[in-house]
A protein has these predicted regions:
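Short alpha-helical
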Residues: 34, 102, 130-131, 186-187
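Substrate-recognition "cap/lid" segment bordering the active-site pocket of phosphatases
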Residues: 108, 122, 128-179, 189
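Active-site neighborhood of HAD-like aspartate-dependent phosphohydrolases
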Residues: 1-44
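A metal-dependent, Asp-based hydrolase signature
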Residues: 33, 41, 45-93
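Alpha-helical elements of Rossmann-like donor-binding domains used by nucleotide-donor carbohydrate transfer enzymes
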Residues: 22-23, 38, 73-77, 93, ...
């Protein structure tokens, strides 16, 4: 079958999760790269633990927390692990920057070309809808994305099969008509 929709992961694929390093370096000199890497690693670890700890639930994980909350918890863990001060003002600056991560420079042109081909475009993300909406708007991509899909309604993170099933619930097409794009190998594998 022909591809009818191109669905992108958000964090790490459309939005550079490591762009937070610049602000982190300003706030914590010499620690920006460590903060960016550890923060992202812990964020992903939390999503996996939550989904894997309750794999047979029919109504999502009882341990589910919105991605924004996990992002904040991951930052707190990271700062504690690196023995850095968790001063509220600095934490809020980092969190606000995370809500407006730098998009990769080629995104807009690529999305415009996909739209010009008549294909449906979407994001499927662990991110909460408000996080995704902020990031998409900040990046100027709201006119080139047809759908922004969050896993929040099912209370399971990617790589649960149910999370990828949200695409067909939102866009009435067959799974083999979807091209899923992610910079994360675990995510691409989960979508297969």
């Amino acid at each position: 079958m022909a591809i009818k929709a191109v669905v992108f992961d958000a964090y790490g694929t459309l939005f550079d999760v490591y762009s937070i390093q610049v602000l982190a370096e300003d706030l914590y000199p010499g620690k920006g790269a460590d903060i960016a890497v550890k923060w992202r690693d812990k964020q992903i670890e939390y999503t996996r633990l939550i989904t894997q700890s309750d794999p047979h639930s029919t109504s999502g994980s009882q341990y589910f927390r919105p991605f924004w909350e996990l992002t904040r918890l991951s930052l707190a863990y990271t700062l504690d692990r690196l023995k850095l001060n968790r001063e509220a003002g600095q934490v809020e600056k980092l969190m606000q920057q995370y809500a407006h991560l730098t998009p990769f420079p080629e995104n807009l042109a690529v999305l415009q070309k996909i739209k010009a081909l008549g294909l449906t475009t979407a994001i499927l993300s662990n991110g909460s809808l408000d996080m995704l909406t902020s990031a998409v708007k900040s990046a100027g991509m709201e006119d080139v994305l047809d759908h922004v899909i969050s896993v929040d309604p099912i209370r399971l993170f990617k790589t649960s099969p149910e999370s990828y099933g949200l695409v067909q619930q939102t866009i009435p097409i067959n799974k083999d008509e979807v091209l899923f794009v992610s910079s994360n190998a675990w995510d691409a594998l989960g979508a297969t």
